[in-house]
């Protein structure tokens, strides 16, 4: 799957949760919060979607060899998508897959949720909860690696029809 914009996040969510939630892949229509933190208001989703599409467009123009800028822009995308929290549930899993696919398009791997590394997940949670771009950028910078084109072509997310 090629990430074209925020709509791709909705496709990913639908694919991941279609057997769990009837509303999988659909934007939430209710206001939500977690631990007292209010997420983005649904009344302004359209503006936020356009903004995230703009950030993704900027990301696509970054040269593959600019790892610093690559990590910074992915952190910015992650921070904004997390604050947006467009789904009632499953936001974290969908956004991690979304970022993984963005990285893969640049020929890089990114696994923000490795099963054997609890500290990565804890730093991810701290960065997203506190909207800490420095922590998110450093984490992404540490986790991205180059992959061969063969791997990138054969390890794509393929949504069900």
Across the structure, where does each feature detected by a protein language model lie?
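FIC/Doc superfamily catalytic core
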Residues: 1-161
């Amino acid at each position: 799957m090629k990430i074209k914009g925020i709509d791709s996040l909705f496709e990913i969510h639908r694919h991941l949760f279609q057997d769990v939630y009837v509303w999988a892949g659909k934007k939430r229509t209710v206001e939500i919060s977690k631990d007292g933190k209010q997420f983005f208001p649904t009344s302004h989703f359209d503006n936020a979607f356009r903004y995230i599409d703009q950030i993704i467009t900027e990301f696509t123009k970054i040269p593959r060899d600019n790892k610093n800028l690559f990590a910074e822009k992915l952190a910015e995308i992650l921070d904004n998508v997390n604050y947006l929290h467009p789904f009632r549930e499953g936001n974290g899993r969908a956004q991690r897959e979304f970022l993984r696919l963005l990285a893969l398009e640049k020929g890089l791997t990114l696994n923000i949720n490795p099963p054997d590394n609890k500290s990565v997940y804890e730093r991810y949670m701290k960065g997203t909860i506190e909207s800490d771009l420095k922590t998110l950028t450093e984490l992404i910078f540490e986790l991205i690696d180059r992959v061969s084109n063969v791997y990138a072509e054969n390890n794509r997310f393929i949504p069900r029809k």
